[in-house]
């Protein structure tokens, strides 16, 4: 079996995600998380080529969005890139992150609010209701 290096694997996944965003299948898509900013930034030149090819934009995510949708270790203290087309959708993502921070700061981050934020994040990622529910049910590593 042929071995694929990590850089090529992650770049190939990003290519697929950019194509899905361009086609309207996904509103936003996440690249594979990286352990360091330097690792994430090593993809920039290639990601820029993908963005040009697929007419999408990229946003460097330096503070992973932790919700019950994914295991904490997937995004905590990791660096990522978000691919998107519509600036309003990126703003919706940023607003959702801020809403979570405010809820935590004011003591209103209840189980219902946690679920609501995770659900809305899943919708931004264009997941089906069934897919969101499955991810929530399967996640055994919540904050």
Which residue stretches match the model-derived regions?
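A conserved ligand/cofactor-binding region detector
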Residues: 1-102, 106-109, 120, 129-138
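An amphipathic, hydrophobic-aromatic interaction surface with interspersed Lys/Arg
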Residues: 115-122
């Amino acid at each position: 079996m042929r071995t694929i290096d990590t850089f090529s694997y992650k770049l190939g996944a990003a290519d697929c995600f950019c194509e899905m965003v361009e086609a309207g299948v996904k509103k936003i898509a996440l690249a594979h998380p990286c352990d360091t900013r330097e690792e994430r930034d090593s993809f920039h030149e290639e990601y820029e080529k993908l963005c040009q090819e697929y007419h999408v934009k990229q946003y460097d995510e330096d503070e992973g969005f932790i919700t019950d949708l994914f295991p904490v270790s997937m995004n905590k203290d990791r660096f990522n890139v978000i691919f998107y087309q519509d600036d309003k959708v990126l703003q919706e993502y940023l607003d959702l992150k801020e809403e979570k921070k405010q809820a935590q700061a004011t003591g209103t981050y209840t189980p219902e609010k946690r679920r609501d934020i995770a659900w809305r994040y899943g919708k931004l990622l264009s997941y089906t209701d069934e897919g969101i529910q499955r991810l929530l049910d399967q996640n055994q590593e919540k904050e």
